[in-house]
Amino acid sequence: MLYPQEFDVIVVGGGHAGTEAALAAARMGSRTLLLTHNIETLGQMSCNPSIGGIGKGHLVKEVDALGGAMALATDEGGIQFRILNSSKGPAVRATRAQADRILYKAAIRRMLENQPNLWLFQQAVDDLMVEGDRVVGAITQVGIRFRARTVVLTAGTFLDGKIHVGLNNYSAGRAGDPPAVSLSARLKELQLPQGRLKTGTPPRIDGRSIDFSQCEEQPGDGMPGGVNEGTLPVFSFMGSTAMHPRQVPCWITHTNERTHEIIRSGFDRSPMFTGKIEGVGPRYCPSVEDKINRFADKDSHQIFLEPEGLTTHEFYPNGISTSLPFDVQYDLVRSMRGLENAHILRPGYAIEYDYFDPRSLKSNFETRQIQGLFFAGQINGTTGYEEAAAQGLFAGINAALQCRGESAWLPRRDEAYLGVLVNDLITKGVTEPYRMFTSRAEFRLQLREDNADMRLTEAGRRMGLVDDARWDAFSRKRDAVARETERLKSTWVNPRNLPAEESARVLGKSIEHEYNLFDLLRRPDVTYDALTGMDGGKYASTAVSRETLGELSAPVIEQVEIAAKYAGYIDRQKDEVQRAFYYENLQLPQELDYMQVAALSIEVRQKLQKHRPETLGQASRISGVTPAAVSLLLVHLKKGGFRGFTAQQADEVAA
């Protein structure tokens, strides 16, 4: 039957990408339908029970700054929080949380069910409705046809998914869930360029069978013995520690030579080493057999025993993802200290699935071949909940904007890790599952977790993503930061009004001439609290006190202090951004035949002709396109007088 109601946006899949896509489109006012094969698995954490980490936590903060769900759900479900790299600079500090799977999923489900403009429907999608070169809807497994102006596909590992345990394999989207075979076949019919990737998960262990006295305890921040014992982190800009459930520790054990012998003995029955698995696995989350093979010189690897929740005994042994036969899994687990009597609740497995080359997507994640069809998440060759959530949000935003008849939202590489993620995917593609790191961002001093809201919330408000409560909190923070920064810049101290002993205590020596407080705060060893506490607190401001700002007080002071400490570095990076901006925004003529650009090598011509980048900046990031080739292309465009290009260039120069 044809469903009587028509939608603006249909989202296929209810994982981390699908939920953020559906929520974003609905927040923007689009009539949105989320189709999932099982409503009970909305927001399910299919692999590790954690959110965040280096680079990943930055993405979660950006999703949150745009009104997304992941950070708030983590605050509600997080049973251990840690700030990674806390001793390093703010650009690379990252929040990571262990999450209670049940609490996290319940938080996501509640947000979906209470979101205006969003309808949920339980049915697997088998086909797309395509008229000419445009998608017009989706068809479910029982033949229900839903019409829509746009479709966002977030199928995760379900596209022709195949699970491997030893030399045994079977079709599945994940353990216990069926694959999307018909939909995968339909996408192949549309001749979208695709490949195979794989990922894996470890066996789960019953905590009652673990001897924790033989393991090393790893408490989180805010817990006795934690690295930052006095401070319990919060993930969302709208979150609070009051939202957190009870906090619990993780535990650490290690593999040993016996473990490695057991693993090596199973290589002849490993689907990875016998050619049963075609797909490439994630480099930065390798299976334990891959680790033992690649790092043969290491006699031990750290294994983190992570609790799956407060109401279960299940533990996730992070570090032994495997597709080895179950008898090998059983022996390798029991060879480790503290796990000698471990009972395995679920076997580990590898899953192989289809992905589609993200270089065939436009800058807004719309497919080039089919108008109105957007891809997000693991279907684009990424790995990780956080990367999926960020892509889902991005695709949902742009599907809604297309329905409004508005131009796409395309954050730049200097504006957001989301911009880095999108740009990397559409220009470089993937040869292995893509994971975000801070090292992928050229301008990471500007792209910190702490300022994600300062970078993105205003854009989110303009697009309709940010509600009044979030906007009010952001506005108070932004205004307080501006006022306090200005106050410090206009407050002066000199040898006459600042006692020498106070100056020496806080600054290390007495001052000899006049300084404003902001300049003094730029000194590496001077903290905001010490500076404003000089001379009996004479320079403190009640405007940024906890009594005035409540929970916003600490983030405001942090922003002011970072702005002072890193002012010189950030200014230099802004100059680099300006230089990059010139190339980034130069639109390349769509009619340009790269094969006729004689100055370029055949390899470069072929790559440009194949990928057809939209801007000179995108062209510069295609693998094999050298800076010299970019310069030659620029010369060719200037000489050729391509329509719009020379005028556009003149506008840039004038600006």
Curated annotation (Swiss-Prot):
NAD(+) binds at residues 281-295. GO terms for molecular function: flavin adenine dinucleotide binding. Its cofactor is FAD. It holds the Pfam family GIDA. Keywords: Cytoplasm, FAD, Flavoprotein, NAD, tRNA processing. GO terms for biological process: tRNA methylation; tRNA wobble uridine modification. InterPro entries: FAD/NAD-bd_sf, GIDA_C_N, MnmG, MnmG-rel, MnmG-rel_CS, MnmG_C, MnmG_C_subdom, MnmG_C_subdom_sf. GO terms for cellular component: cytosol. Homodimer. Heterotetramer of two MnmE and two MnmG subunits. Belongs to the MnmG family. This is tRNA uridine 5-carboxymethylaminomethyl modification enzyme MnmG.
